[in-house]
Amino acid sequence: MAITISVNGKPRTSQAAPATALLYVLRNDFELNAAKFGCGAAQCGACTVLVDDKPVRSCVTPVSAVGKSNVTTLEGLGSSDKLHALQQAFIDEQAAQCGYCIPGMIMSAKALLDFNPKPSEAEIVEALVGNLCRCGTHNRIVRAIKRAAGVPA
């Protein structure tokens, strides 16, 4: 049975079973590979996407659960001609080392900045509590989010 969901503002159809994790539909059916499989238990944040502007862990979210919601992935931010402010700030602050966590970090940061455009450092850290970086670049990630928000680092 076909399932149609809105991804990055466009309707997309998959033949996946309703219980299939959203992450696998995004990656395998729609070839949107920014969200990553990290733990499979919603503990690391590598799979974070936005569903109706709220961060969700796509590795444990059944595709059927997103229904008529809009799913936004990193690929839906900015364009090849003009990066989203968060993407540019992560580059400018050299926030990535291996880069595996970065899509999830950016999506969590986007949700934060959409809700709170000028967050404090404590609010940024709290918003990222579900996103892990094994390389230890959390300080650069926080600086990048501050830069994107126009908050002095």
What does each model-identified segment do?
Residues 1-153:
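Signature of N-terminal electron-transfer/Fe-S-associated modules in redox systems
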